[in-house]
């Protein structure tokens, strides 16, 4: 089932593919750039290993996470409506979501800085946009079932 929501001005707010299987890891992507969020969602889903949900309004992230129940959340650090730190704080304050790993994405960090293990508020930070298999690597390294952390 595909669920798509648009704002009153036609901007994509959320595009979700829900599947009946529990065997795939669930990744929530929160990014105000709808093209990036949708392409990341499609790329993850095309691997056959993930169910992904893209949210373009960070003010909807908590509500979406509660219904989607992600295994991992990828959050843009800088967004106009609410920044990634605010989104992370909301998720961490929710009893059902507080243990879900969060990874920040930002253009303010280089790949070298990310490899050095830079963190913001205890969360891993990766350069944005992670491309292709770099996105898969970020997801795999941060899923609770797959990471060493």
What are these regions (language model features)?
Residues 30-31, 55, 73:
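Conserved sequence signature across two-component system core domains
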């Amino acid at each position: 089932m595909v669920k798509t929501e648009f704002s009153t001005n036609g901007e994509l707010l959320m595009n979700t593919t829900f599947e009946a299987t529990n065997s795939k890891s669930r990744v929530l992507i929160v990014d105000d750039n709808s093209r990036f969020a949708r392409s990341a969602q499609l790329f993850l889903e095309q691997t056959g290993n993930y169910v992904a949900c893209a949210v373009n309004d960070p003010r909807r992230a908590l509500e979406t996470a509660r219904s989607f129940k992600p295994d991992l959340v990828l959050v843009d650090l800088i967004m106009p409506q609410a920044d990634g730190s605010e989104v992370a704080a909301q998720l961490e304050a929710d009893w059902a979501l507080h243990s879900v790993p969060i990874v920040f994405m930002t253009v303010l960090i280089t790949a070298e800085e990310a490899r050095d293990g830079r963190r913001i508020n205890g969360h891993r930070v990766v350069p944005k946009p992670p491309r292709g298999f770099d996105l898969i690597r970020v997801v795999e390294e941060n899923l609770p079932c797959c990471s060493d952390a």
